[in-house]
Swiss-Prot record:
It comes from Alkalilimnicola ehrlichii (strain ATCC BAA-1101 / DSM 17681 / MLHE-1). This is Large ribosomal subunit protein uL24. Part of the 50S ribosomal subunit. Belongs to the universal ribosomal protein uL24 family. The gene is rplX. It comes from the Bacteria.
Length: 106
């Protein structure tokens, strides 16, 4: 079970975007990276291709960030928080915040 999943709200805890919040767009488990919206935005210079109708120019896009630089956002404390995994009575696994022991998904 992954501690951070697609659709989670996260806080950046290290790097040039430290302190910013965003939603996870995509998870790359083999690289241990996450794509977070409006975080780690870079500018790419693209050459136009008139044969295919593509315009050139400067394009901004998000790049993946390593999952160690991200913490799950806890709405109760309004901060980034560490996450653990616990087995419930029915045998299923659930994620919980380590600061206040509340379940992440309910």
């Amino acid at each position: 079970m992954r501690k951070i999943r697609q659709g989670d709200d996260v806080v950046i805890i290290a790097g040039k975007d430290k302190g910013r919040r965003g939603r996870v767009i995509r998870v790359y488990p083999d690289q241990e990276k996450l794509l977070v919206e409006n975080v780690n935005v870079v500018k790419r210079h693209r050459k136009g291709n008139p044969q295919q109708g593509e315009a050139g120019g400067i394009i901004e896009q998000e790049k993946p960030i390593h999952q160690s630089n991200v913490a799950l956002y806890n709405p109760a404390t309004e901060k980034g928080d560490r996450v653990g995994i616990r087995v419930l009575e029915d045998g299923s696994k659930a994620r919980y915040f380590k600061s206040n022991n509340e379940l992440v998904d309910g």
